[in-house]
Regions:
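Signature of dsDNA virion morphogenesis modules
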Residues: 1-181
Length: 182
């Protein structure tokens, strides 16, 4: 197993997702270092035998000319991850290369979840607004902030964040230098 397979992945963004939650831009910046060294698994399985990849770098990328539903510049937390390019991972690598395994979801802990309508922190109570509904023309969603921890990213069929997923991949042999992708 002298070869590794490296791929870029969009972990999450500050866009409102399918669960009517979004990360603040500041929380994306807080999550970036927390995801370095975290594992990539399938379907949020917590079995160590299901670990497939590991994140070795993260960065925030502003999507020029694109904005979130609430008018912020769209920013994505992106990562570089690697896995062994061996027989055990061959089918997963083929599925990634073919665009079949593409979507991902993250697991993390956020200390705050503020309602877009009233501004109250749902983690502290005091908000009866329902995410996904409109109140006086304003969409109700929660803004997640104050990152406490990052646990993993998972390959999933339907991610909460529509744009989360694999964006580019590389294969390296022992003769090539992984620094080239940094």
């Amino acid at each position: 197993a002298d070869e590794i397979y490296v791929f870029n992945v969009t972990l999450c963004s500050n866009e409102v997702d399918r669960d009517y939650e979004k990360f603040s831009i500041e929380s994306l910046k807080q999550l970036a270092p927390l995801f370095i060294g975290k594992t990539g698994i399938s379907d949020h399985s917590m079995k160590s035998s299901d670990q497939k990849a590991r994140i070795f770098d993260t960065y925030i990328e502003k999507q020029d000319g694109r904005f979130t539903v609430d008018g912020e510049p769209l920013c994505c937390l992106k990562a570089k991850a690697y896995m062994l390019n061996n027989e055990k991972n061959a089918s997963l690598i083929e599925e990634i290369d073919a665009g079949i395994k593409k979507e991902v979801s993250v697991s993390c802990s956020m200390s705050s979840s503020k309602c877009s309508v009233c501004g109250n922190d749902r983690k502290k109570g005091g908000c009866s607004h329902i995410r996904g509904r409109e109140y006086n023309g304003k969409l109700c969603f929660d803004t997640l902030s104050n990152a406490a921890d990052a646990y993993e990213f998972s390959f999933v069929a339907v991610p909460a964040q529509r744009e989360a997923g694999i964006t580019k991949s590389f294969k390296f042999t022992q003769e090539e230098n992984m620094q080239d992708v940094l």
